[in-house]
Amino acid sequence: MSDSKDQIYQDAKGAVGAFEFDERVAHVFTDMINRSVPGYAMMLEMIGVISRRYAQAGAHCYDLGCSLGASTLAIRSNLKHFNESDNKPKVIGVDNSAAMVERCRVNMERMPSVIPTEILCQDILSTPIENASIAVMNFTLQFIPLAQREDLLHRIAVNMKPGGAMVLSEKIEFADTDKQHTLFDLHHDFKRSRGYSDLEIAQKRSALENVLVPETIEAHIERLQRAGFSQAYLWFQCFNFVSFLAIK
């Protein structure tokens, strides 16, 4: 994984363009997400724990929006109990950023495994989902147009084996104004504690405007249930960042 420091928004810009997962972001993404998302390391660790329990022999484990492959590796490294199996699960990472996929493939090669792994450069809205026992979307759905989110989750649920699991991690908003302001401000305090300046925070926020569209916890759980998951739980929250577990 790249450990280059995120300085993309360090200098004042006359006009801040829309955020893109381009070469610049791919180069510093590991630093960016660890300094921007409170609890990120814990989420990755628990994705591994969840994968160990719910991955099924011969089934597919999807990381949809895999970026540099942190979640992909968390899944794969917890499938070692299948190493001697003749019916191993297959791990499939998907991302539509060529810059991310290129680096992700390198990261997979640096940590070889006998678990079959494929990294695809595709739009997850058109990626075939088949024979799934695990599906992870780690801060991905928030970048999908609102009108297309439910169809995507329904397609995942329909093509998931009984007893399979989905992990959905998202930045959220709150209907309660006081809670929204308090946790929003605490998130910015977290970013300052990780070395981001007020200018960097403001410019990144501007870049993400209308690109990252958050929703409430209730909206996410209700959608997961409508999509076809029998159970949907909030299992993690740190300020305005959460993760859900949905069971088929």
From Swiss-Prot:
Swiss-Prot/TrEMBL keywords: S-adenosyl-L-methionine, Transferase
InterPro entries noted in UniProt: CmoA, Methyltransf_25, SAM-dependent_MTases_sf
Positions bound to S-adenosyl-L-methionine: Y40, G65, C66, S67, D95, N96, D123, I124, N138, R205
Molecular function GO terms recorded: carboxyl- or carbamoyltransferase activity; S-adenosyl-L-methionine binding
One Pfam family matching this protein: Methyltransf_25
EC class (word): transferase
Function of the molecule: Catalyzes the conversion of S-adenosyl-L-methionine (SAM) to carboxy-S-adenosyl-L-methionine (Cx-SAM).
Family to which this protein belongs: Belongs to the class I-like SAM-binding methyltransferase superfamily. Cx-SAM synthase family.
Protein name as it appears in the record: Carboxy-S-adenosyl-L-methionine synthase
Taxonomic lineage from the root: Bacteria, Pseudomonadati, Pseudomonadota, Gammaproteobacteria, Oceanospirillales
Gene that this polypeptide is encoded by: cmoA
